[in-house]
């Protein structure tokens, strides 16, 4: 079953600074569900920029990149270096799991 909006937004709030997660990690099997929850969100303090596509590409372009760079999220070209990934269920970054 897909997570609720509240569960998705709680997971986004839990993403540590300097890390990212994917839409699919927020809503396994239904990444568009996570996108819809973020689009409907009214909380200006939600760290939406920490949610990226599975391949590390950005949905919100330059604004998202600037915010992530300010958090020292690493990039490889135009994409986030997914070694900065954090999986909500595991609560650990990819580098911590390696």
Briefly describe each language-model feature range.
Residues 1-98:
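Nucleic acid-binding interface residues in structured DNA/RNA-binding domains
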């Amino acid at each position: 079953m897909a997570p609720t909006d509240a569960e998705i937004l709680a997971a986004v709030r839990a993403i540590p600074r300097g890390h990212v997660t994917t839409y699919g990690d927020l809503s396994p099997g239904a990444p568009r569900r996570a996108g819809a929850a973020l689009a409907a969100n009214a909380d200006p303090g939600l760290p939406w920029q920490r949610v990226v596509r599975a391949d590390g590409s950005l949905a919100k372009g330059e604004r998202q990149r600037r915010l992530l760079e300010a958090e020292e999220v690493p990039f490889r070209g135009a994409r986030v270096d997914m070694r900065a990934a954090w999986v909500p269920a595991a609560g650990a970054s990819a580098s911590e799991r390696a």
